[in-house]
Amino acid sequence: MNLDSFFSFLLKSLIMALSNSSWRLPQPSFFLVGIPGLEESQHWIALPLGILYLLALVGNVTILFIIWMDPSLHQSMYLFLSMLAAIDLVVASSTAPKALAVLLVRAQEIGYTVCLIQMFFTHAFSSMESGVLVAMALDRYVAICHPLHHSTILHPGVIGHIGMVVLVRGLLLLIPFLILLRKLIFCQATIIGHAYCEHMAVVKLACSETTVNRAYGLTVALLVVGLDVLAIGVSYAHILQAVLKVPGNEARLKAFSTCGSHVCVILVFYIPGMFSFLTHRFGHHVPHHVHVLLAILYRLVPPALNPLVYRVKTQKIHQ
């Protein structure tokens, strides 16, 4: 199967997953509450969220523009950074506009299919972002442990294939979400206690059995995060081992500094994400509005901070 036919297959699978004709019952629209318990303060909460979204848009578009326009930045590190910026734009834009509309003007209704599309883009591209962080760790490993062969190992063809694998993984893992959700029967109460269509928030509204949905969602989350964090950890273990062999403190600090921006981005992405995931799944005593706020911030804070981190930590981007 060639690349074109494979992507055609993926597209057909996605269309089938979203198609109403495959299922017996028409599905209702949903109503997004926003931040339950903080309805009176939602206008004020929307202000910092809007600023974060604006920072994400300006910062990531700027990163993409700089890398596109400067041929000297067409290297593996910056090409992976451009992938990260593009993904951050999608993640932020798939949630923020609707969330802000809910908080500011009470535009709470969202169609069933639109809800699924929003959820698909949010979760699929978050998975892709995790994959790009693994690719960036691989790039740092090759740059530090095999510096003389860096350009031959990670040439543009290899970078393109890595990007394709990251994209396909995100799509393949999330298409079953849509298929499983389409099989659920929803009760009359279609009110989502959230500001956007989050997977578990939608699953909890179903009247039918949701064990498979819950199990698959948990499996995908643990699989993606577990394997990706393991890969990043192994890469940095080798990097640390190589750097400690470098003679002289100044040379070691210089080697470590090349990884500084990537380490910051990893921490910004995984720590809030894991905290949000664990509190949503297992933090039954945590107030619901805290769950929602954490989930919204997780979709906006990394896209807003990543360009700032790379601007400060990377000399070429700063210049």
UniProtKB/Swiss-Prot annotation:
Coiled-coil features, chain-numbered ranges: none
GO molecular function: G protein-coupled receptor activity; olfactory receptor activity
Signal peptide annotation: none
Cited Gene3D superfamilies: Rhodopsin 7-helix transmembrane proteins
Keyword Membrane: yes
Membrane topology, from the record: Multi-pass membrane protein
Similarity field: Belongs to the G-protein coupled receptor 1 family.
Protein name per the record: Putative olfactory receptor 52L2
The organism's taxonomic lineage, starting at the top: Eukaryota, Metazoa, Chordata, Craniata, Vertebrata
Gene: OR52L2P
